[in-house]
Regions:
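Conserved hydrophobic/aromatic beta-strand scaffold that supports enzyme active sites
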Residues: 21, 37-41, 59, 78, ...
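Conserved short histidine dyad/triad with adjacent acidic residue
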Residues: 38-54
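A short beta-strand-loop-beta hairpin characteristic of the jelly-roll/cupin
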Residues: 47, 56-83
Length: 132
């Protein structure tokens, strides 16, 4: 019979994207079959590597701070998010979150991929200007 699981905060890992995540719900931590959820903390000036999640959707809830996210096939769009905002990223959409502010950004991230990093595909976009 399946059992409920408790994952205590505090342990973390560095994702392929170049950001630090606090371990949460995943196939690795709980045996989940269809969901992954983590806490992300982005220090001032932090930026993820451009990437997308193959075949998996992402939902984000911003707890604290102001972040920006470039998105689109050439990262041509910019979305500004703040505390209390929800963000939806469809599967396969390139994106790059970054923190242009002088404060920390905290967000809860959930994906329909139960694995922590399996569906992360890094993009080679070195010629694309990085956020300042």
């Amino acid at each position: 019979m399946a059992e409920c699981r408790l994952i205590r905060g505090g342990e973390g890992f560095r994702g392929k994207q170049g950001l630090d995540y606090f371990a949460g719900i995943s196939a690795e931590s709980t045996g989940s079959k269809a969901i992954c959820m983590h806490l992300l903390e982005m220090p001032p000036g932090a930026s993820a590597k451009p990437h997308y999640h193959e075949s998996h959707e992402t939902a984000i809830f911003v707890l604290e701070g102001v972040a920006e996210m470039r998105h689109g096939s050439n990262l041509e769009h910019v979305m500004v998010t703040g505390a209390g905002d929800f963000v939806y990223i469809p599967a396969g959409v390139p994106h790059q979150p970054y923190n242009p502010s002088d404060g920390i950004v905290r967000a809860v991230i959930a994906r329909t991929d139960p694995n922590e990093q399996e569906s992360v595909v890094l993009l080679d976009m070195q010629d694309t200007p990085r956020p300042s």
